[in-house]
Amino acid sequence: MEDPRRRTTAPRAKKPSAKRAPTQPSRTRAHAESCGPQRGARSRRAERDGDTTEKPRAPGPRVHPARATELTKDAQPSAMDAAGATARPAVRVPQQQAILDPELPAVREPQPPADPEARKVVRGPSHRRGARSTGQPRAPRGSRKEPDKLKKVLDKLRLKRKDISEAAETVNKVVERLLRRMQKRESEFKGVEQLNTGSYYEHVKISAPNEFDVMFKLEVPRIELQEYYETGAFYLVKFKRIPRGNPLSHFLEGEVLSATKMLSKFRKIIKEEVKEIKDIDVSVEKEKPGSPAVTLLIRNPEEISVDIILALESKGSWPISTKEGLPIQGWLGTKVRTNLRREPFYLVPKNAKDGNSFQGETWRLSFSHTEKYILNNHGIEKTCCESSGAKCCRKECLKLMKYLLEQLKKEFQELDAFCSYHVKTAIFHMWTQDPQDSQWDPRNLSSCFDKLLAFFLECLRTEKLDHYFIPKFNLFSQELIDRKSKEFLSKKIEYERNNGFPIFDKL
């Protein structure tokens, strides 16, 4: 007697009988990009299992599991076997459920998978560099289990417009007053001009508008740079010709312009001018060894920190150490790179470390103005993140990574050597490596953030993070940060990554 279940579905059978045999779960998803499914994976599985998108249209899987063998056996490769072709998907539904639902790995595999390919389903793209060779647990469990958590963190980190305007208004009053008074008084800094830099002006500030960076730039014509011990980043500054009456001659140590002397006088003038400000509660913070900034503390009533950085502006060619830096040709374009390198470069009084002390005559190259341009024009498409263009999650990943490091530093003094510039440098390299806007789709925020974590962990493991503008200057060298600190940070990031970022719950 013909099975009545087969008669009810006979009019819809058009699939070839070659699709009958059930298959094992496909591993094509293991090779998918972390920012979206791989398009080829579905079509290859369809050749063996039938089009999985048709499964919901088939009759409900009412066949008892005990009937699976009987139905498969009854089905014959015949042109009239229409009913058998439609009944068979019900036999395979339990297997397909494990394949199609990435949220149920425990159903498919109660133990950690022995096949290394299978693990890639939850940890990101297989071709990325990262902490894969560290022996640490691999799966970005936080990103996988709580995809909305990162978005909630970003919402809390978003600055309120009211707070921004109030803080910016107060800072601008203080900075403009200092700038005017310095330009009016007869001193070596009469020609200074303002240049806004830092995370606030790059629109990547997090939590609260309580930190600002402002450059007071001073043009110095016809200077000659002497690289300090082949660092590529630190230089001795000399004048090719010192005009008679040049006020900067007061800061010379022989032929070399002393960064320490110049910063000391700059600091003295700012302290004098701050004392004249009566309507705002502002003071000058104690000097920090090796810091190029004069830090102001404004109470508004909340405390606002303002770093005023003296910078020498040179309109000459960029130093030879930067020739291979700024590798944006395949991302923002060769023309943009050429134009950026035609802009002036800057030197700040950040001294090179010499053992346990600092070399007081040295200056360090600064590219804050170029970094600001990149962050505000980060898309391969000119309209990226504009009101009329598609959005990306580049800056969101940067904010999350900055916040993660910031919170870890608050808890562990072993991380004092690390700073947000390390995060910024790492993500510049990631944007260069993955230049397409589609690779930073906001819908894939968790996997994009995990890519950044993996890259940063690999930099810590290999102790190598090249300066984005000066490739031979390694920001993670043993001379700058000891190995123990890098291993400590790596373990803390791995813990957060594999446990759903519990540190974010403290926000």
From Swiss-Prot:
Reported impact of K278R: Does not affect ubiquitination by TRIM56
Residues covered by region (Required for activation upon DNA viral infection): 119-132
Cross-referenced InterPro entries: Mab-21-like_nuc_Trfase (IPR046903), Mab-21_HhH/H2TH-like (IPR046906), MAB21L/cGLR (IPR024810)
Effect of K217R: Reduced sumoylation
Modification N6-acetyllysine, positions: K372, K382, K402
Post-translational modification: The N-terminal disordered part (1-146) is phosphorylated by AURKB during the G2-M transition, blocking CGAS liquid phase separation and preventing activation. Phosphorylation at Tyr-201 by BLK promotes cytosolic retention. Localizes into the nucleus following dephosphorylation at Tyr-201. Phosphorylation at Ser-420 activates the nucleotidyltransferase activity. Dephosphorylation at Ser-420 by PPP6C impairs its ability to bind GTP, thereby inactivating it. Phosphorylation at Thr-52 and Ser-199 by PRKDC inhibits its cyclic GMP-AMP synthase activity by impairing homodimerization and activation. Ubiquitinated at Lys-402 via 'Lys-48'-linked polyubiquitin chains, leading to its SQSTM1-mediated autophagic degradation. Interaction with TRIM14 promotes recruitment of USP14, leading to deubiquitinate Lys-402 and stabilize CGAS. Ubiquitinated at Lys-372 by RNF185 via 'Lys-27'-linked polyubiquitination, promoting CGAS cyclic GMP-AMP synthase activity. Monoubiquitination at Lys-335 by TRIM56 promotes oligomerization and subsequent activation. Monoubiquitination by TRIM41 promotes CGAS activation.
Notes on how activity is controlled: The enzyme activity is strongly increased by double-stranded DNA (dsDNA), but not by single-stranded DNA or RNA. DNA-binding induces the formation of liquid-like droplets in which CGAS is activated. Liquid-like droplets also create a selective environment that restricts entry of negative regulators, such as TREX1 or BANF1/BAF, allowing sensing of DNA. A number of mechanisms exist to restrict its activity toward self-DNA.
Molecular functions per Gene Ontology: 2',3'-cyclic GMP-AMP synthase activity; ATP binding; chromatin binding; DNA binding; double-stranded DNA binding; GTP binding; metal ion binding; molecular condensate scaffold activity
Annotated consequence of substituting D213A: Abolishes ability to promote type-I interferon production
Site residues, Arginine-anchor: R241
Region of interest: DNA-binding: 1-146, 158-201, 372-395
Positions of post-translational Phosphothreonine modification: T52
Residue numbers spanned by region Interaction with collided ribosomes: 329-370
Domain description: The N-terminal disordered part (1-146) binds unspecifically dsDNA and expand the binding and moving range of CGAS on dsDNA. The disordered and positively charged residues enhance CGAS-DNA phase separation by increasing the valencies of DNA-binding. The N-terminus is required to sense chromatin and its phosphorylation blocks its activation by chromatin DNA. When the N-terminal part (1-146) is missing the protein bound to dsDNA homodimerizes.
PANTHER family membership: CELL FATE DETERMINING PROTEIN MAB21-RELATED (PTHR10656), CYCLIC GMP-AMP SYNTHASE (PTHR10656:SF35)
Family statement: Belongs to the mab-21 family.
Protein name from the UniProt record: Cyclic GMP-AMP synthase
Organism from which the protein derives: Mus musculus
Lineage: Eukaryota, Metazoa, Chordata, Craniata, Vertebrata
Annotated gene: Cgas
